[in-house]
């Protein structure tokens, strides 16, 4: 199948596009986008990959599925376009960065600046029906994004995989911990974060310390 995705990713996971599950997934997604509002916009479905080529990946932050309200989803986990009100989870991410690194709250929730530095902001499910969380789960996206995680683990070294919440933490089994660092905590959503285990996890400083120990330029969070 002809899927528009950044070329280095095509070289590493392009074989997925010809598998039956992906053909079925593509047909499902096309039908959904024709029938009902879905997010993100079609041109941004593979935004995480297109903004962060395979060879540039340093950090992987795994989310579950896209924001499902108008104007929010942009193909990057946790990110919202410039001018959009910060969702609660993103506010808590920025609060932790502020406490951890002293970086002030940014003016925008657009995390493209992270992606361009080598942070793969990967949702396990890349599309969603408007107003219906998890509506495109178990249609094939998870198999595709698991393949991406596996090939990153296999073909690269010294990556930092950041897993927030039970769903993301279930992906730890796909990652070779002899070559990579996994940072885990509860999810930054208020429901989880306010029970403890989110604030003070120091994931951003710990991530950068690991990168620097391995001669890799740290992320400007």
Predicted regions and their residues:
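A polyanion-binding, active-site-adjacent surface
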Residues: 3, 15-163, 168-170, 175-176, ...
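Generic N-terminal amphipathic, Lys/Arg-enriched alpha-helix
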Residues: 1-13
């Amino acid at each position: 199948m002809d899927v528009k995705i950044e070329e280095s990713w095509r070289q590493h996971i392009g074989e997925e596009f010809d598998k039956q599950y992906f053909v079925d997934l593509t047909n499902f997604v096309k039908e959904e986008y024709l029938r009902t509002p879905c997010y993100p916009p079609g041109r941004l479905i593979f935004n995480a990959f297109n903004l962060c080529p395979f060879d540039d990946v340093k950090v992987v932050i795994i989310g579950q599925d896209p924001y499902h309200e108008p104007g929010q989803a942009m193909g990057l986990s946790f990110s919202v376009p410039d001018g959009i009100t910060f969702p609660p989870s993103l506010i808590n991410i920025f609060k932790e960065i502020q406490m951890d690194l002293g970086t002030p709250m940014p003016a925008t929730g657009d995390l493209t600046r992270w992606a361009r530095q080598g942070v793969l902001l990967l949702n396990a499910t890349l599309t969603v029906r408007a107003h219906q969380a998890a509506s495109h789960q178990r249609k094939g996206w998870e198999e595709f994004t698991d393949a991406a995680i596996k090939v990153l683990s296999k073909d690269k070294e010294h990556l930092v995989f950041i897993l927030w919440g039970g769903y993301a933490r279930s992906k730890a089994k796909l990652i070779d911990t002899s070559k990579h660092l996994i940072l885990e905590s509860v999810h930054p959503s208020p429901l989880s974060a306010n029970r403890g285990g989110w604030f003070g996890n120091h994931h951003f400083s710990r991530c950068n310390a690991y990168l620097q120990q391995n001669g890799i330029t740290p992320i400007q969070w």
